[in-house]
């Protein structure tokens, strides 16, 4: 009799647990059991729960190194694909760690370039620890390059002598790819190479936050290089971060900003952006079809216009 079997099954389950009990997998009981002669070591439930990463927030950053001059304006001197993961505790939804996967996709510069990340709006005290992963050894070895301009600390993975949170990403980008400075990589000219990813894992001091400590709007990726005999490195930041100035070890030269006007030498675009091929200007008004994105120039002049310019490339002039 099926009905009788179900009744006996229910009675059996009631018999093996009290009204506040629970049936759990081996090693996952949420009930505290004191140690004793009959209970052995007892049981202390794990209150932390397991962590799970959220779906990544993904963007691509492209840079032009001729700031504040136009040059070839092809925005492939450094190309970064960035994914941000928030590792949350399943039980509480608290954010424990924030992971940035920074992939170096291209190096189209004719001079040595470094890459850094300043995280605005937070303090070093907000970070318990920084760890690295992925292809981190390739990136970290690039800080040994004679072209490196970062005061890199190989214990904290941040930059020394800067009160802000500045995380060096690459001392010299060509070095990460294993080629000499000036060699074009993944731009349609020069060599085609594997992309490499630097995982930056930031463990938070406050382990009870449910809202992210920082987001894309705080990620100030920049490129830098030696300019003539200047002691400070020359930095190229996204237009949105010009108001923060340079990092402690860098300069952006106010006269350069005045000359630049509304133009930009670094942009954040949707992930997987198909950047211009080498020597192809991102946008031209005289011969639009000879550029990569004819609408870009109008967006750069007024950012309320042509906001989807990146969806309308000249196919033969873009890479990827």
Label each region the model flagged.
Residues 1-320:
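Extracellular distal adhesion/interaction modules in secreted or cell-surface proteins
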